[in-house]
Amino acid sequence: MSRNKDIKIYNISNAFVRIEYNDKVLLCDPWLTNGIFDKAWMVYPPVYDVDKAINGVTHVFISHIHKDHCDFNLMRHFPKTTEFYIPDIFPNDKIKLQLNNLGFNNIHMLPINKDISIGSDMVFNVIPPMNMYGHETEEMVKANINGVPLDCGLLLTTEFHKICILADDSPYYFDHLTDLHEKLNKVDLLMLPYNGYAA
């Protein structure tokens, strides 16, 4: 791995994070298009310099298919050489299909809980969904309904850094916490959802 220790991390908005390391510019869960979800959701505070947020992008990680984490309108402006990394769970094949339709071909479906080298200086490990609904309510435990868990997180490791980005992957189910606790040993930065609905 590279000997460079410098890493820059910017929280652009919501779960949208920009990470600069060596020759990589990684965007996680890019979202800047206002009016998603029937014009109800807006980027706040507003991001006025979109070019600055996405300039130089080389890699993108998308944790799940929701529009506040997967903004196809924004991603159509990325270079066609951009490499995309998506957890290989249902329904993320739809993300891959839409990216193909936009002209992107460097799309990698990542297995859960497995270290995947991104070049020679970075490793991704997808954290599995730790919730069904993402709602903070005891009634969900009692509900006789099974949701479709899709909110994944990312553990990003370099030779000098360990960063965990949970996005919307709220750790509600305690049976998953032992594995997560082991992964987070000596983590440098942990990004958690600030409520049960959005990161």
Write out the residue ranges for each language-model feature.
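Metallo-beta-lactamase
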Residues: 2-4, 87-161
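Divalent metal-coordination and catalytic microenvironments
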Residues: 19, 29, 64, 71, ...
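Cap/insert and terminal regions of metallo-dependent hydrolase folds
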Residues: 83-86, 171-199
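Active-site HxH/HxHxD metal-binding segment of metal-dependent hydrolases
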Residues: 47-116, 133
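Pre-active-site segment of Zn-dependent metallo-hydrolases
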Residues: 21-61, 72-77, 134-138, 172-185
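Structural motif
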Residues: 61, 85, 165-166, 191
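Active-site metal-binding loops of divalent metal-dependent hydrolases
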Residues: 30-32, 65, 129-130, 168-170, ...
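Conserved beta-strand hairpin/beta-sheet module of binuclear metal-dependent hydrolase folds
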Residues: 2-49, 147-169
